[in-house]
A protein has these predicted regions:
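Oxyanion/phosphate-interacting regions
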Residues: 1-10, 152-155, 172-246
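Acidic beta-strand-loop-alpha-helix segment within the catalytic core
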Residues: 82, 86-172, 223-246
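General beta-strand structural signal in soluble alpha/beta enzymes
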Residues: 47-51, 65, 74, 162-165, ...
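Short, Asp-centered acidic motifs that coordinate Mg2+ and/or phosphate
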Residues: 47, 136, 180-181
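N-terminal subdomain of lithium-sensitive/metallo-dependent phosphomonoesterases centered on the IMPase/IPPase/PAP
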Residues: 1-68, 241-246
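Glycine-rich active-site/cofactor-binding loop and its immediate structural neighborhood
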Residues: 62-95
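Residue-level signal for inorganic ion chemistry
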Residues: 28, 39, 71, 103, ...
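Short glycine-aspartate micro-motif
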Residues: 62-64, 99-101, 182
């Protein structure tokens, strides 16, 4: 897919408006077409929820697709963007049974099955156990004013920040112990986290949507939005949520 769109001038033209409300770029559309075609070819009806196409009813199984998480990185050639696919047995976050995240930059494939753990390139995740402090926080935000407005409340319990530009990749890094917590200052949709959240939860880590219903009841749709906090322990996750409210 990327070989067909090698240059920035190929990837970034706006070709439409996604049902999620954002512009659809050429790379968004190309990846979505390829993934949906593959899913359709595998047969079996499913209800599709995709950032670009919207909701396509079709069966009791739900497939939640984010063709490109980190579109600006993808357009500019920064190697931090991903494909996310989640499979669910119903319309809520708690119904997700399988998650897949592909990191285009590193080539890493992250997967999780409900009740069967999380894996990286087919091997079980065995990262460092969660810490009781945050040495590295993966902060996801699109505007400098959001970062400037919230970082003062983080000073007391966060040592260092990293901003990758892909919420799904950040959550995968948390699941593997590469970062200690994740905080999205911009409200995210279900398509942004449906796959990666399962890796976090299968590791026994905590994740919350402060502006949404209880996490498991959060709908798999394109309307609901909430900031996201996640950490290795429920205490750290609660501290992050409290910092957001300040």
């Amino acid at each position: 897919m990327l070989a067909e769109l090698p240059a920035r001038s190929d990837r970034e033209p706006v070709v439409g408006a996604g049902m999620g409300g954002d512009d659809t770029t050429a790379i968004d559309a190309a990846v979505e077409r390829a993934v949906v075609a593959r899913l359709d070819a595998d047969g079996g009806g499913f209800t599709l929820v995709s950032e670009e196409l919207g909701v396509r009813p079709g069966g009791e199984t739900w497939v939640v697709l984010d063709p490109i998480d980190g579109s600006i990185n993808a357009k500019r050639g920064l190697p931090f963007f991903s494909l996310s696919v989640a499979v669910a047995e119903g319309p809520t976050m708690g119904d997700v049974t399988f998650g897949y995240v592909y990191d285009f930059g590193s080539g890493e494939e992250w997967t999780a099955e409900r009740g069967r753990g999380a894996r990286l390139n087919g091997e079980p995740l065995r990262g460092e156990p969660p810490k009781d402090r945050i040495e590295i926080l993966a902060l996801e935000a699109t505007r400098t004013d959001l970062v400037a407005g919230h970082t003062p409340s983080l000073v007391d319990f966060v040592h260092r920040l990293r901003i990758f530009g892909s919420l799904a990749i950040s959550l995968c890094h948390l699941a593997d112990g590469r970062v200690d917590a994740v905080c999205s200052l911009k409200a995210a949709r279900a398509v942004d986290i449906a796959a990666a959240q399962l890796l976090v939860r299968e590791r026994g880590y905590a994740i919350d949507l402060p502006e949404a219903p209880p996490f498991e009841a959060a709908p798999l749709d394109l309307e609901g939005r909430s900031r996201v906090v996640a950490a290795g322990t429920t205490g750290l996750c609660a501290a992050m949520a409290a910092a957001l409210s300040e």
